[in-house]
């Protein structure tokens, strides 16, 4: 029987290690532990201030966890982890989304991530341009990581037509 573990990770953009040389819309942050054999990632919630230029949608891009494809000319495969609809573009209101409304599906990654100890985060528009969040307006969000069994000497998993199979070449 396959066992999975759910991890919920809270991220605050104000905790980025080098705020003087990064922005709240494009940064890297260390995770509290190394996560192994990540099968899926899902945005649980987000509090997001107004962005510049004003947008109807903001795309959350987290390197290695993206599973949403885009049809925009500069989009492509694995463009974003989540598409976040902003209720009123350009307002100073904080937008909060919650997956209890099934806004953000939990989509399995085509190729599970063997290990991850850092997140590379970008907030983008539909064309892939990194947005601007005014100085001092930080954001906060939570993601859920679903991790499979950690198997020494051959962990990882593979998605086949009949489901997910433990083991593999990683």
UniProtKB/Swiss-Prot annotation:
Tell me the keywords, alphabetical order.
Capsid protein, Glycoprotein, Late protein, Virion
Has keyword Glycoprotein?
A: yes
Q: Looking at the record, which segments are called Disordered? A: 1-25
What switches on its expression? Expressed in the late phase of the viral replicative cycle.
According to the record, which residues are glycosylated? Answer: 21, 93, 129, 137
The listed locations are: Virion
Q: How is it modified after translation?
A: Glycosylated. The pattern of glycosylation sites are unusual.
Determine if Glycoprotein is one of this entry's keywords: yes
Principal location listed in the UniProt entry? virion
For this record, the Gene Ontology CC terms, alphabetical, are: viral capsid
Q: What does this protein do?
A: Constitutes the 12 pentameric capsomers positioned at the 5-fold vertices of the outer capsid shell. One of the vertex is composed of a variant of P1 (type II pentameric capsomer) and has thereby a structure slightly different from the other verteces (type I pentameric capsomers).
Q: What is the recorded name of this protein?
A: Penton capsid protein P1
């Amino acid at each position: 029987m396959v066992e999975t573990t759910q991890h919920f990770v809270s991220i605050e953009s104000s905790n980025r290690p080098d705020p003087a040389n990064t922005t709240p819309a494009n940064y890297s942050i260390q995770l509290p532990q190394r996560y192994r054999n990540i099968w899926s990632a899902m945005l649980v919630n987000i509090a997001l201030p107004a962005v510049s230029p004003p947008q109807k949608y903001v795309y959350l891009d987290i390197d290695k966890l993206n599973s949403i494809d885009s049809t925009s000319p500069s989009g492509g495969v694995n463009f974003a982890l989540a598409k976040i609809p902003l209720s009123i573009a350009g307002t100073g209101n904080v937008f909060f989304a919650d997956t209890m409304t099934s806004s953000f599906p939990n989509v399995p990654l085509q190729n599970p991530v063997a290990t991850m100890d850092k997140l590379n985060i970008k907030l983008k528009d539909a064309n892939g341009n990194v947005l601007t969040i005014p100085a001092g307006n930080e954001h906060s969000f939570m993601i859920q990581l679903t991790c499979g069994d950690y198997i020494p000497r051959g962990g990882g998993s593979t998605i086949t037509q009949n489901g997910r199979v433990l083991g593999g070449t990683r």
